[in-house]
Amino acid sequence: MSKLYLMSLGCNKNLVDSEIMLGHLSAYELCDEPSKADVLIVNTCGFIDSAKKESINAILDLHEQRKKDSLLVVTGCLMQRYREELMKELPEVDLFTGVGDYERIDEMILKKTNLFSNSTYLQSENSKRIITGSNSHAFIKIAEGCNQKCSFCAIPSFKGKLKSREISSIIAELKDLVARGYKDFSFIAQDTSSYLFDKGEKDGLIRLIDEVEKIKGIRAARILYLYPTSASEALIKRIIASEIFINYFDMPLQHISDNMLKIMKRGANSTRLKEMLNLMKSAPNSFLRTGFIVGHPGESEADFEELCEFVKDFGFDRISVFAYSKEEDTAAFDMEQVPFKVINKRLKIIEKIVDEVIEKSFEKEVGQKRLVVCTGKSSEGEFFIAAKDLRWDREIDGEILINESECGNLEMGQIYECEILQNLDKKLLAKALRKVDAN
């Protein structure tokens, strides 16, 4: 049997695309050593400069490790965005494809031909897919593309306009995954709260929640990548009222200064953002994640200081911060740029603040009883079982280390009630109290 090595870079949306490719390459034996693979695939990210560099380095590194007569295939966002340039500049690569042909990857490899469809691939209920990284959790991609006009973001230029999956397609996929033992789901898209806007429906995500709740066997669900102008008060209240959807609110804000929100074309002012955030925060056991960009053109010291004070005071649970990346095909590309030195200085300042905020979020968990999912052996040592809080998204929100159990041996993928005993530098030490019925 021929061997396959696949490297998936970037976001969880890319991961789903990689899992689709794996589903269509099930005839291959997966291996974790590039030097032994007959086919090597890199699913690239082309979002910001650092991601582009990571993708190029990964391609060149795999070329150095590959064996003679193997096939190196490059796909994904970077390829879609820089197709002509990369095909000229990367003679190391054997086959190229973009973001439209994941279901045809087997055909492409068999025929040894490049494929570039004109439209972005949209998953259906019939898509073959092999879930990786968990036996209980899966990401569910509900749409592709984006209709927003953010000044810094090039995604619409290579992913295209919003294209939503039909609700029936998503429900069919969920039912299949539940039948296979999956019970924890994260719903994703470039802009999840605009789901079905392209079909003229403004409450599409609410209707999807209604339908998901009818499926027996789902233990938890959360929605990522809410957008400030498409996320309504009604949507937030519907999530809060749900017995299946966790009060997990992931809304990348990018800034809080009204001046910067206008320049960045975010569509909502700080008053509107704070109203929504306070509603989210009022929910029982709420968990708030966001992201910010520093150094975007037009950001003054006053804007940056306002952002820092807001980050200090609001009480987010998790925050990602990025230095502004100058990207072609964006409105900000031709604006007067903030000097790199200033951007780096601001990034260091806010990263320190963010670190302290996240530490407080972990610290407040001590003494709480939480539902957690066992995810496997911990890298911290043989005496710990790794787990995640049921509220959290997979991998990005933290790790719980269980080293005591009042309910015998712990099963992977099973839900337990745990008492959080200690915060160990953003990892929580816990004791398992009881097994929780998955139904």
Swiss-Prot record:
GO terms classed as biological process: tRNA modification
Keyword Transferase: yes
Annotated binding of [4Fe-4S] cluster 2, by residue: C146, C150, C153
Recorded catalytic activity of this chain's protein: L-aspartate(89)-[ribosomal protein uS12]-hydrogen + (sulfur carrier)-SH + AH2 + 2 S-adenosyl-L-methionine = 3-methylsulfanyl-L-aspartate(89)-[ribosomal protein uS12]-hydrogen + (sulfur carrier)-H + 5'-deoxyadenosine + L-methionine + A + S-adenosyl-L-homocysteine + 2 H(+)
Domain of life per record: Bacteria
Cofactor details (free text): Binds 2 [4Fe-4S] clusters. One cluster is coordinated with 3 cysteines and an exchangeable S-adenosyl-L-methionine.
Regions crossing the membrane: none
Cofactor: [4Fe-4S] cluster
Residues noted as binding [4Fe-4S] cluster 1 in the record, renumbered to the chain: C11, C45, C77
EC number(s) given by UniProt: 2.8.4.4
Residue span(s) of domain Radical SAM core: 132-363
GO MF annotation, one: 4 iron, 4 sulfur cluster binding
Broad class of enzyme this protein falls into: transferase
Pfam family, one: UPF0004
Family per record: Belongs to the methylthiotransferase family. RimO subfamily.
Function: Catalyzes the methylthiolation of an aspartic acid residue of ribosomal protein uS12.
Protein name: Ribosomal protein uS12 methylthiotransferase RimO
